[in-house]
Amino acid sequence: MTKKEWNEIHQEKLRIYSGILFHNQTFGSGNGETVICYDFSCPEFTRLREKYRLEEIAGTGTDFARAKRLMHYLAPRLHHSSWYDNHVPCNAWDLLAYSLDNPEQGINCLNKAKILAECCLAVGISARRVSIMPYSPYDFDNHVVTEVWLCAVRPLFCCMK
């Protein structure tokens, strides 16, 4: 690659990312007063916790250790499929019934993250799904992970591959 070609490529990237920044000047300019509250008492969590023995799997200890145990229990038992069409309702109860220990019924990262987040919530660990979107006109892929909030530490992202 010549120096001229290299400069042209980097100028194009600069134009793209300058446009992205221009169109998102107000992103994140809130007043910082947003409060997120979790309701761990919903009946669906009780049903999920009991059917899948989530308290037993999570065990005792820190929220980090408990979330990690849930992740290590679920990840190898849920087959990943990028081609999954999201036809099952997006909740842990229905998704686990469809895909747990069933490699023929793979699900994508969006739904694996939903399962882990709801299983964490069912045992009282604050968690949510986070979508990671590339902001490039050349990259149309994305990824979804579970963010577990640990009061004593910063948020931790758990990714089930």
Label each residue range with its predicted role.
Residues 4-108:
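Secondary-structure boundary elements
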Residues 114-161:
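Hydrophobic/aromatic-rich core segments of domains that either
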Residues 73, 77-80, 111-119, 123:
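Long, hydrophobic/aromatic-enriched structural stretches that serve as scaffold segments
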